[in-house]
């Protein structure tokens, strides 16, 4: 059903087309005017006109019919289920009454930062081992004595008691804990073995560290924290080298910043890289090629505890692509 909303009667002579009249009268486009006519909204002398080019003459009466607005049915509401965030799985290597040794997966923080991230290795372990909440010297790092970068993976020890925490903390301070990594770097490293001794300090970019250059006499040009990294070549590829890396100090991002200073940045590193070396292989790898393969420390009895870890499948499968 329609209701007339407006009528126009031509008293003056006119020879305009119907569509042109509407464009001038209502300041609309020719297309809009033609659409009104074609949708049977216009009556000329009480007869529906669908001809856009209908010629108007003196005495013609135009009625613009306003059709009732029929609202389309509201779309059905469906409960949208958001898939839960996939958290990398933690592999537990061993559990004792004093400590837990795990393999931290790539992509997971060791502990939350000042941003209070909800997902971390520490948070996951606390759910399974609630006693960890009382261990350590920082509530954000329950039981955590050392850490692995979020992008890295591999072995990590977590203290279950305060006594073990203090015992491990002292070993790290005395630098008696053994940590070795499997690391793939850009470029063909010439030496089968070498040491990197550049001191490390925080860069102007707060997210980065920097290896400080040394003078000809071997002293750092700027004061920084002493750092020592030792490596052995495991395998050479055309443009890459697989290394076994041992760190004798535990500076933040030590392996990554030292390898960058050695002109051999770690493959897949989103933070420490050289533009000329970053290529498609970093994307193909899909992650930082740095995995802690060896960890050794002494327990409360003074016995040496040693653990080894194999490269994860994604890194094992990546290496043959480089041959």
Which ranges hold each PLM region?
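RNA pseudouridine synthases
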Residues: 2-323
